[in-house]
Regions:
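Catalytic-core segments of thiol-dependent peptidases
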Residues: 1-75
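Active-site-proximal C-terminal subdomain of hydrolase catalytic domains
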Residues: 67-165
């Protein structure tokens, strides 16, 4: 990866997938604590279930900057305001992508994959770019927390090169 005028440097990407983790909050807590980008696709459970913010404490989040995408039906109603107070630094360290409408499950994987590809594409994607890439489910998405970001993709030159080793 190369940022601005810095010398290029190596970095690692680790992708964790969980399938069928719909009753226990343990895998979600592990993923939240150990990720810079957390992407969830599944039921919002009407605000209850394993992702209920009441199941989490500030200790379940890293101190680093983090993006969380809660790709479930009307997830904005259940998650947009409750995770932010749990995160050290609030919106300076957490951007939360949520859906205002129902998100059809049959296109969710495609939308999540396109979001991730745009994020890791090697350029400097803005949230507009990321949301346009993930529009397959057209769930009226919103990003909370981006207004006070220090990093601005339009002001930084980041280049990611993927090599096979």
């Amino acid at each position: 990866m190369k940022v601005g005028n810095e010398s290029p440097r190596d970095f690692a990407i680790q992708i964790l997938f969980y399938f069928g983790a719909d009753s226990s909050s343990a895998p979600h807590k592990f993923a939240t604590k150990n990720s810079d980008v957390f992407i969830y696709n599944g039921h919002s459970s009407i605000g209850y279930g394993p992702l209920d913010p009441r199941n989490f404490t500030s200790a379940d989040f890293p101190s680093s900057y983090q993006i969380m995408w809660m790709d479930g039906c009307a997830s904005y109603n259940y998650y947009h305001k409750d995770y932010i107070p749990l995160k050290e630094g609030g919106t300076k360290n957490l951007d939360l992508v949520t859906n205002g409408l129902e998100a059809p499950a049959w296109r969710g994987g495609t939308a999540n994959g396109k979001f991730l590809v745009a994020l890791l594409s090697g350029g400097t994607s803005s949230y507009k770019d990321l949301l346009l890439a993930a529009r397959d489910t057209e769930a009226m998405r919103v990003v909370d927390g981006e207004l006070d970001n220090v990093y601005k993709p339009t002001k930084a030159s980041t280049r990611v090169t993927i090599t096979n080793r």
